[in-house]
C-alpha cells in the first residue's frame, strides 16, 4: 500500500488511486536500475504533497509580486542556504522546474540566438539541452559537439580543446546522461579559460555523489553548475542552478522573469528537506555505496562477457554495449523488465543502430542502493541480467518468469520508502 495512505484520492477518484497503488507495488517489486531514477524519503514525499502547492510566489524572497509570503520566503531562503552550504558555492537558485529549464536559463543568461555553444554529442553520452539538433538549444544556437575516443570510450579532451580553440563558444557544457567515468573539471576549466567560454557543469546525474564526496566537485572550476534535484540527490522532481557570485544576478534574472513565472513552492520545500538529508553523515555513506555497487556490478558483468563502454565505471552508471550478444538494447530492456529488472535501452558511442533501437543498455545503482543492496548482491543481479538477456534471444519465457519471482523474493526483505506491503 502507498505510504502515506491516499484515502482521499481513493474516495474522489478510485481509478487514479488504483493506478497509484499499482505503481507503488511495481516500484517495490522491481530492481529499479534506470540511472536517472531513485526513491525519495517519506519526508520529501510529505513536503511535495503539502498545502504549499496552493501558493503563488512570483519573485524572490523579500521581492515578491504577491502577498502572503511570510512562510514561503523562509522556506526558499532555507533551501538556498542549504544548497550553498552543501556544495560550497557562492550562490544558488532553487526555482527551476526541472533540468531542461535550468539549462535553458543558462543560455538565456549568457547567450543570444545564433551564438556558438559546445557540448557533448547526445549519442556519445551528452544531453538534449547541450545543443542537440532536435532540442530548442540546437535550433536557437549554433552547436558544436565533442565525443569520446574510439579506443577507450572516454572523453576526448584533445578534441574538446581543439574545437574550443577553433569555434570559440560562448558556453562549454560538461556532463551528460551516459558518462560512466569521472569528469575532469580542472581540464575543462583550463580549456574554457583559454578560449573565453563560460564553463557550465551539468551534474544532474552525479549531484548526490558530489554532495557525498564520491565524485570530484566542479566548484572552483565551473562558472555555473546546473543539476536536477532527483537522481542521485534523492530529492523531488526539480532543479537548481549554482554559480559564482559574479554570475548570480544574471542567473536569477534568467530564471525569473526571463523564463519562468512563480516557483513551485511545494517542490522548494521538498528540495530543502532533501538537502538537509544530503548533509547528514549517512548520505555520505550512501553515495560511496552507490559507487561500490556500480563497480561490483561492472566487474560481475565483465566476468560474464559483457562489453562495458570505457571498460567500467567510476560513478552510479554502467553502459553496456550488447553488440557481441547479437541482441538490440530495446528487446533486451523489455526482457529485463519482464524479469523484474528495470533499465533503459541507450545508444552507445559510435552506435550503428538507430536511437529508438540502439545497441546499448544504461544501468544505474542509485535506487537499489537506497533499498539497501550492497556489493554482495551484485553478482546475483549480474547473473539475473545475463540469464534474462540469454532467455530473450531464445524466447524462453519460463526463465524470465522464474527470475521475476526470485527478484520479488529478494526485494521483499528491503523496505521501500513510500510503500508498505500488505500482511
Describe every region a protein language model picked out.
Residues 1-78, 410-412, 417-423:
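N-terminal glycine-rich, Lys/His-bearing helix-loop that initiates the first secondary-structure elements
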Residues 2-14, 81, 292-293, 353-423:
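PLP-dependent enzyme catalytic core of the Aspartate aminotransferase-like
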Residues 23-29, 54-61, 169, 248-253, ...:
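Short acidic (Asp/Glu) and glycine-rich catalytic loops that position anionic groups and cofactors
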Residues 30, 61-62, 91, 262-265, ...:
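Flexible, glycine/charged-enriched surface loops at secondary-structure junctions
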Residues 74, 78, 82-305:
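Conserved PLP-enzyme active-site core in the AAT-like
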Residues 272, 289-295, 311-321, 352-354, ...:
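A glycine-rich phosphate-binding loop feature that marks nucleotide/adenosyl-phosphate handling sites
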Residues 307-372:
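Conserved PLP-binding catalytic core of the aspartate aminotransferase-like
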